[in-house]
């Protein structure tokens, strides 16, 4: 079930945060929870892993150390209405310069670590296998749910108002908003960083947890966070995505 503001504020009150409701209202952001789905994969459908759907004859993206690895694709027509500045239509395929074999020297903070293929019209796409590997790639269909998000920690706001007990209650409130480690928008979440990873002028775009079944291991089993310049998102320009992990 989608979580709205009234439900969130009710939960905050139940956790003893009634005196901080104005702060919570001020820092609220829309987010979209990403859930795994057991449906069979279809062409053009949102997914993590598997085989990307691209235009016929598309060239597989590469970087200086070799081929990118397919991360997943998002069909924006499948997302709920409460989606911030995310597009209403189109297909976005994401690739990562991550190499489980350890041969690539790309770092998740490097420019170009994430590569994207944006298709405003996905009606003519078809599955395109990587010419660099004949290994079958596990994949899973996705479904989406609207939620709201609040800051992950004190580093993400200028005026953190909580003592230790209040911080614990606030973290419990945030945990209740996320049915998955994977989500769009909101605030980035991590396991080990002592700073706000959001670059200046950028918005959190995608946060992903590590997943052994998909061979995802970000920063020793932590999280991958992808960011986009706010003006580029409004222009549907995904050519310069940034990343961090921790």
Features from the language model and the residues they span:
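Preference for intrinsically disordered or flexible, low-complexity segments
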Residues: 1-246
